[in-house]
From Swiss-Prot:
Belongs to the GTP cyclohydrolase I family. QueF type 2 subfamily. It holds the Pfam family QueF_N. GO terms for biological process: queuosine biosynthetic process; tRNA modification. The active site is at C184, D191. It comes from the Bacteria. One of its GO terms (cellular component) is cytoplasm. It is found in: Cytoplasm. This is NADPH-dependent 7-cyano-7-deazaguanine reductase. Pathway: tRNA modification; tRNA-queuosine biosynthesis. GO terms for molecular function: preQ1 synthase activity. Its EC number is 1.7.1.13. NADPH binds at S85, K86, R252, G253.
Length: 276
């Protein structure tokens, strides 16, 4: 079956447009990938958001002076569409030689265009470089599982059968790994990320979680679908009282994508990690 992104700019030579062109945005319906996981828009078992950070955002004042900022875009996890990443980059680049009356005027334009592409209201923040610099590099709480000794014999497909838990011991903890890697389903390029699991329920075997995450290493899918698959596999195993899964992916083309899925309506921290 042809991937829905095959008609997008991904993997193709693209002309870089330097004047405002909202038609560059390429939405991709979430429906097909939800169906692969046995889900529909009416049966999503999670809440969440996809946070995109843009580090290559610039436009002109009415006097022709360039301005730069860091953009933060929050796309609801239940929006009908995701936005294909290269088209997102091309759209943002189209602002470079376009003049806007104010920062707020640009923010309103971005919100309008991105919400139209996603099919749901998208949150937009334009932040100064000093503001972001003051936050520094984030450090994750909880336990890093990357030094656990595991044997790995498969990387092609996610292997939820590797996951183990102790049903007789209920815990509340946060586990994380910097070893998440998957691949773009169109170009095959690697997507590197940090994966955070925060839960309350039967104790998850950390080594089994690490082996499971490593099994994504040659898997081809978008960031958002990888996180949803991980969330569902953990939910099926643990039947937890609380669960959130958060991936902080390394940026590409000036954009990083950070999908968050949770049983609760909680806004995740958006502080960048060391590889971002």
């Amino acid at each position: 079956m042809q991937h829905p992104a095959e008609h997008s700019p991904l993997g193709k030579t693209s002309e870089y447009v330097s004047s405002y062109t909202p038609s560059l945005l390429f939405p991709i319906s979430r429906t097909a990938k939800w169906a692969e996981l046995g889900l529909s828009a009416e049966t999503l078992p999670y809440r969440g958001v996809d946070i995109w950070n843009c580090y290559e955002l610039s436009w002109l004042t009415p006097a022709g002076k360039p301005v730069v900022a860091i953009g933060e875009f929050s796309i609801p996890a239940d929006s009908p569409n995701i936005i294909e990443s290269k088209s997102f980059k091309l759209y943002l680049n189209s602002l470079n030689q376009s003049a806007f009356d104010s920062r707020e005027a640009l923010r309103a334009v971005l919100q309008k265009d991105l919400s139209a592409a996603a099919g749901a209201p998208v949150g937009v923040r334009l932040r100064s470089l000093d503001e972001v610099a003051e936050e520094g590099i984030g450090r994750l709480p909880g336990r890093c599982i990357d030094e656990l000794d595991i044997a790995v014999d498969g990387y092609e497909q996610p292997r939820p059968e590797l996951l183990r838990c102790d049903a007789g011991r209920i815990v509340e903890e946060q586990l994380y790994s910097h070893l998440l890697k998957s691949n773009c389903p169109v170009t095959g390029q690697p997507d590197w990320g940090t994966l955070v699991v925060d839960y309350r329920g039967p104790a998850l075997d950390p080594a089994s979680l690490l082996a499971y995450l490593v099994s994504f290493r040659q898997h081809q899918d978008f960031h958002e679908q990888c996180v949803e698959r991980i969330f569902l596999d953990l939910q099926r195993l643990l039947q937890p009282q609380a669960l959130s899964v958060y991936a902080r992916y390394v940026r590409r083309g000036g954009l990083d994508i950070n999908p968050y899925r949770s049983l609760a309506e909680v806004a995740p921290d958006n502080r960048r990690l060391v590889r971002q």
